[in-house]
Amino acid sequence: MMTKVGEVLLLLLLPAFVPHTDGTHYSLPGKPTEIKCRSPEKETFTCWWKPGSDGGLPTTYALYYRKEGSDVVHECPDYHTAGKNSCFFNKNNTLIWVSYNITVVATNALGKTYSDPQDIDVVYIVQPHPPEKLEVTVMKDQGWPFLRVSWEPPRKADTRSGWITLIYELRVKLEDEESEWENHAAGQQKMFNIFSLRSGGTYLIQVRCKPDHGFWSEWSSTSYVKVPEYLHREKSVWILVLVFSAFILLLLTWLIHMNSHSLKHCMLPPVPGPKIKGFDKQLLKSGKSDEVFSALVVSDFPPTTSNYEDLLVEYLEVYMPEQQELMVDKGKDHDGCLKSIGSASDSDSGRGSCDSDNLLMDKSGAPKEEQQQQNQEGDQIGKETQGPKEAWEKEAMPCANEDVVSPDASSEKVKTWPSVFSPVTPYSPLDPHNSLEMHKQHCLSNTQFPPGSPSSDHYIKEALQSSYWEVCFNNNQPYPQTEVHPQLQAHSDRNISAVNDRNAPTGLLLPTRMTEYVEVQRVNEENKVLLHPIPSGHSREKACPWVGQRDDYSKVKGVDSDNGLLLQREVVEEESMEMAGAAESCYTSSIAFTTPKQTACSPVALPVQDERVLAVSGYVDTATVFSVHT
């Protein structure tokens, strides 16, 4: 007890006497700092601290800890295993998932100094040791080298049992150059390959590791490796490639420089200047814009006073058929017609209506001369062959030059021969005889002329002088002429239609001079009524002596209000039948009725007994004969 009191007194008196003895100053030790604890494998851990000043006196350090949930303070179990200013906790003193409260105390002759307390958990303070046995090998893959790096985990890390799991990272850099490290994450594998190496370069390689929850370990020792030269054989190839590339680049540069002007014009074409006629650029530059614009503006535009009718242009459209469209085409209807002079047009195309009664084609020139020649030749032949019939032929020729058109036949087409016709004259109500001639068309029957016969022209001329005439009332055109008479037929086809059916009945009246009779001869095998005129009593025997005498004859009485032909029955003495063999010298004509069947001049007529109506007064009404079925 007395010793302890003496020690205390000594310590109290010592500071008072020490400064006076050697002139030094003493103080309490400094506070320990930077306390850290690390566990390399989660089984043991070590704590380090940094000591403070000792105060001029010998100072000792002690580590005290207290476990979580306990008030018992424990001192460090081992100050020597981990080195100076450290404390090592072995497996017996290490617990995981338990927090440790650690405090370091510095003590000297003047007193004690306590550090700040530090709480640690062994699980989160794990920092393993660096990997061991680092090896680097140069490998080749298809002639290209690469580095294969391998290592082993720290010896104290129990990675096999899974107590601790480590991940690795390595870094590589060239030795000759002061370049930065190139880091590569390797994961949990203990081998890694490095590609894209420089030929002949030396590389430095290091590896480190860390647990799932913890800190990276220190870098392992550096491993050096040199990559062999693997591009020495290709140096010449690369040199050649560079030379050729430079040559091509130089050539392209020279071509671009030589063609720079053309290229400039191609990519950047020049902007054309103003090309306005009368544009003065000097006036524009001087700022006199009014004068420039006044030179460009046209005076009196738009025109204030102008006869716009002068600007209109009238066009005259003339319809000219190709190669006489009136020529008959076999098996076809002919609708071509020319617009006659002085006739009104019924359409904007300039083509006259084919339904007008005045649209007859006016022949001139050679056709007229041909008509005159044919008429003269016909007269001569008629005089030589048919001399006894002169009186009757002269009276029959006006009828041969006329066309009988029914008022009901509005769509009838009559075939004519120009050799016996003159131009059609306009209708005049004062001249009924001329109006009748204007509206009639003569139609000769060519049934007796075989196609292509050389004497057809001669027969036609003789028939024109005959005392018989034939009228066609059908809707179909007669059979066309053969190729022997193409020119005659081309100039002779005329299409004539009645004017508005019944609008002009007076123009169709028969001549007022009722001196000519019509004899009903017979009905032939084609159902045609054969008639022949009887101008006088003595000429009738001369006209056709072979004709048999009948008990009844028909006299043209007139035309009734319905435009029907009225024939008067009359008894005449019979003539002898001795001249019956002379039938070849007479040419008969017939009034044909409308049927679908075609003949040489007109279709086969309907039965005559169905077309005639005998009136009570003794007249034969043939109005139905001339009415055409539409």
UniProtKB/Swiss-Prot annotation:
Biased-composition ranges, Low complexity, are 340-357
List the InterPro entries. Answer: FN3_dom (IPR003961), FN3_sf (IPR036116), Growth/epo_recpt_lig-bind (IPR015152), Ig-like_fold (IPR013783), Long_hematopoietin_rcpt_CS (IPR003528)
Where is motif Box 1 motif found?
A: 267-275
Q: Please, which domain of life does this record's source organism belong to?
A: Eukaryota
What keywords does the record list, in alphabetical order? Disulfide bond, Glycoprotein, Membrane, Metal-binding, Receptor, Repeat, Signal, Transmembrane, Transmembrane helix, Zinc
Per UniProt, the short sequence motif WSXWS motif occupies residue numbers 216-220
Provide the transmembrane region boundaries.
235-258
What are the boundaries of the signal sequence? 1-23
Cysteines paired by S-S bonds: C37-C47, C76-C87
GO MF: cytokine receptor activity; metal ion binding
Residues annotated to bind Zn(2+): D212, H213
Chief site of localization: membrane
Which residues lie toward the Extracellular compartment? 24-234
Membrane topology classification: Single-pass type I membrane protein
The family note in this entry says: Belongs to the type I cytokine receptor family. Type 1 subfamily.
Give the protein's function: This is a receptor for the anterior pituitary hormone prolactin.
Q: Which PANTHER family match?
A: CYTOKINE RECEPTOR, INTERLEUKIN 5 RECEPTOR SUBUNIT ALPHA
Protein name per Swiss-Prot or TrEMBL: Prolactin receptor
What is the species listed in this Swiss-Prot or TrEMBL entry? Oreochromis niloticus (Nile tilapia)
